[in-house]
Amino acid sequence: YLKSRGVTRNTSSFYMRNLRSAYKLAVQENLTIDRQPFHCVYTGVDKTKKRAISIPDIRKIKSADLSHRPALDFARDMLMFSFYTRGMSFVDMAYLCKKDVASGYIIYRRRKTGQKLSIALVPEMQAIICKYQNSTQYLLPIITKEDGTERQQYRNQLIRINRHLKKIGTMTGISIPLSTGQRIFPVGGNGQL
């Protein structure tokens, strides 16, 4: 079923691992008999090729005239902010707070690992921060209301920005599909264009 819907092998494996865990819990709670339905089901993970955006492509994105397309301009700015911050994840960008900026650095903890990171604030990052000043505690306007819906706002922006990045990729002739999860910090790079 999943294959017929165009779901990749790794995504299918993720779903099957979750389903298998739920089934094992049901067996432990004596809600069903263990018939081992996952005996021959692949639940491993295949290595995927990481595709980085090249510096010339980053330059194309940066120089694209999006002045009359504010939604695309915002998506581009978020991608560029990630580039300047050495590939900061979108979720970390969403939850960055103004208090995380001090003495010329952004100092934050990765949401995924809890690892504390420090990144020098460069003029290009500062320009994006100034462009999107807002009245919330958050540095960037990914989360715009502090009303308990922050996680949903993050998810909605993630979907919206990824859709806009794909449009930018098409407009600029970039062959790699752009997304917030895209590797944009080339090995050996320093975030400079």
Whereabouts are the PLM-identified features?
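Short, charged phosphate-coordinating catalytic segments
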Residues: K24-I33, S82-S103
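Short, basic (Lys/Arg/His-rich) helix/loop patches that form interaction surfaces
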Residues: S63, S67-P70, N162-L193
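Conserved tyrosine-mediated DNA breakage-rejoining catalytic core shared by Y-recombinases
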Residues: C40, Y95-K131
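Short, contiguous acidic/charged loop-to-helix segments that flank catalytic cores in large enzymes
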Residues: L66-R69, I107-L117, G148-Q157, S175-S179
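Active-site/catalytic core of tyrosine-dependent DNA strand-transfer enzymes
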Residues: I58, V122-S175
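DNA breakage-rejoining catalytic core of tyrosine-based enzymes
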Residues: V45-S63, Q115-V122, Q137
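C-terminal catalytic core of tyrosine-transesterase DNA break-rejoin enzymes
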Residues: M80, Y84, M88-D92, I184-L193
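N-terminal core-binding DNA-recognition domain of tyrosine recombinases/integrases
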Residues: Y1-K49, A64-S67
